[in-house]
Amino acid sequence: VNHCSSQHEWFQKAMADPDGEYGTYFYIKEGKNGQPPTNWRSYFGGSVWEKVPGYENKFYLHSFAKEQPDLNWENEVVREKIYEMICWWMDQGLAGFRIDAIMNIKKDLIWSDLEPDGPDGLADVYKVTGKVKGIGDFLLEMKHRCFEPYDALTVGEAMFVKEEILPQFIGDQGYFSTIFAFEPCHAYRKGKNYMDYGWPQPFDDWKKETFHNQKIIEKAGFEANIIENHDQPRGASLFIPEEDYGFYSLSALAMIMLCQRGLPFLYQGQEIGMSNRRWEYAEFNDLETINQYHIAREAGMSEEQALKIASHHSRDNARTPMQWNHDENAGFSTEKPWMPVNENYKIVNVK
């Protein structure tokens, strides 16, 4: 609920009349002599600002891809429509929600530049999220309006919440039932680019982060433990060296996860040990991966080196078709799937 699609009716109407009612559903700002209003960098690289079609000095905000315009949570009408949508789904019988990218809904309304942190002169947008105050008001309102009346289970994608404010986020009095334990499984991320990441996951760092996380969480509630999700490479490849991949190593990885205190989350394919596949550049679909490949090339890496790094860390690894059996396309479809099937599907599949 941080953003919608650029194909959504609201956004289409906003682009047709940015000064009208639907323009207030988004963050549309005047630029600086045709340049973006701020120097914030999107999560996928490049400016968070995109020009409104037909206007030289109007821009809309997108923390992620330009096809994902951020919704204006400061607009009460927008919040009411979001709550109405959530409650509609709860009325259909849903038990709860995974709430994605939720920490991005509160913006710095001063719209000030940040100290650049890269050669592009931009600064990561998450630094804005980390310094603004008042997100709790939105989260509590959403909880009281949408989740409490249904006794819903909610899992927030809230990264790197400080220990002293954890009780505000999880437990009976928290904004959510629980949040994902990202810190341990992100221990390999030693910088902001793929080429700075470790491979495979450094075990000692993972162990240290896991024990630390478990210790601080127990005072407030419990976390949702993960090894992988749709935004990461396959855990079977990230945590296990390729030469050690097999039944026993996968079983050990599963045991470590399942024996931790908290709520284990299994991502589709994880239960059978689905792993990363080998990629060609033309096969990548993920915008983040494509951008990271080019960042590696611009840093002086060869095509082969950049492809290897991109293949290791690409989110596309977690988005290949589920491997049901050894039939064509792993039994996923008789038609050509939108992403290529992992080459090992004849060995690694549900059947």
PLM segments and residue spans:
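Conserved alpha/beta catalytic core and glycan-binding cleft of carbohydrate-active enzymes
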Residues: 6-39, 139, 143-321, 326-329
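Hydrophobic residues within beta-strands of alpha/beta enzymes
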Residues: 97-99
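C-terminal catalytic domain of photolyase/cryptochrome flavoproteins
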Residues: 317-319, 323-350
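Short phosphate-binding/catalytic loops that engage adenosine nucleotides
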Residues: 94
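Short glycine/proline-rich turn/loop motifs
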Residues: 59-74, 121-123, 231-240, 341-350
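Acidic/aromatic-lined carbohydrate-recognition and catalytic surfaces
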Residues: 1-87, 91, 104-164, 169-171, ...
